[in-house]
Amino acid sequence: MRPSDVYPEGAEFGFELLVCRWAEAAWPPDGGSDGDAVIVARQLGTKRRRWDTVVVECDPAGLAARARFGDRELDSDLLHVVRHAPAEWAWYRDALPHPGYPWRYVRAAVHRAAGRGVVEKRRRNNRIEIRRVAPYPDWVRRIVAVENKPDLDASAARALSDQLARDVDTALADEVWVATAATGGRVEPALLEDVPVEVGILAFAFDADAPGDAWADATVEWHPSDVTPADAESDEERTTTRLELAERAYGAGWRSYHDTMRPDCRHFELRRYGRALVPHCAAKGGPQTAAECAGSCPDFEPEPPVWRTGGWPVEGGPGKGIQSLLRDRREWVRRREYPETGDADAGEN
């Protein structure tokens, strides 16, 4: 399979998935590592800015401790409860800092948190008291943002330049990169475009037939600057926003693209590309984007029930096989990142 079979004519979706899979297995780009674990997510950000790929560099022990709170994201309301829950029983209004909005919303978050088992709750003297199940760990070390532009020509660079400059100025991410497809020239065209000097440039060459890790060759064409502000430690708003972002990455990962596609279509397939599994449409005879893979697609056909029959009644539902496979891959990666789980099979994806 050629790269053009995954991201034809510079299409970003397939390129983005390959970059995510590479980052999951090989981050950081320079090959050096401080022993960080990594979580990779895609299409993640804030109300004002969304990044193509987000890499969360984590403390391995902290990431393992984060697992105590489950596999799902803790949203901002739950984080407010879990981070400040006391070691001993206390009325929730005494235990938690004022949120800046009515306490009834905090009370609802307390009930949700207790329902998920991330805090303990009891009623005493007609008051709701809470107690933590474990200290919420300091598990996030750095957040890296990556913009994926397989065809970074002059017009694409101009459109992206202002966004990258804002990323550098706001410094919500500690490091910003642009990922592009390698051309094989002596000087990659991306180096000649209008990209802020603080932004790193990664050039990728993918080869599905190459053995092992050689399927993805990432070359650092320009090293980024660390844009972490000097007062980062004392900036509580920045810390909270980054933690919310990291929690969304933890809950979603990058394989959640099936949530915006139609894996319940009989034409939806996953095909191996190197060490990645990428979507493929049998009706089109090639890759599909999330926008194309929708119920409005003229080639959409429901998955035949016989495909998921294991006796009677039918097990699961339409598209559950695809979703289960992607979920299993994600859980394998999570186990690999936890220090107490031991070695994992390098052939997984």
Residue ranges with predicted function:
Residues 1-21:
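A short, highly charged nucleic-acid-interacting micro-segment common to nuclease
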Residues 27-47:
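A short acidic/basic microdomain associated with nuclease active sites
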Residues 42-44, 133-136, 165-167, 190-192:
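Short, flexible, glycine/charge-rich loop motifs used to bind or transfer phosphoryl groups or to couple energy/partner
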Residues 48, 140-141, 171, 197:
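Structured loop/turn residues at beta-strand edges in well-structured enzyme cores
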Residues 51, 144, 174, 199, ...:
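Residue-level detector of short, conserved catalytic/binding motifs and their immediate flanks
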Residues 51-160, 177:
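Conserved catalytic cores of phosphodiester-cleaving nucleases, focusing on short active-site segments
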Residues 103-134, 182-349:
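Non-catalytic C-terminal interaction segments of nucleic acid-processing enzymes
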Residues 155-195:
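Short, charged, amphipathic alpha-helix that recurs within catalytic cores of restriction-modification
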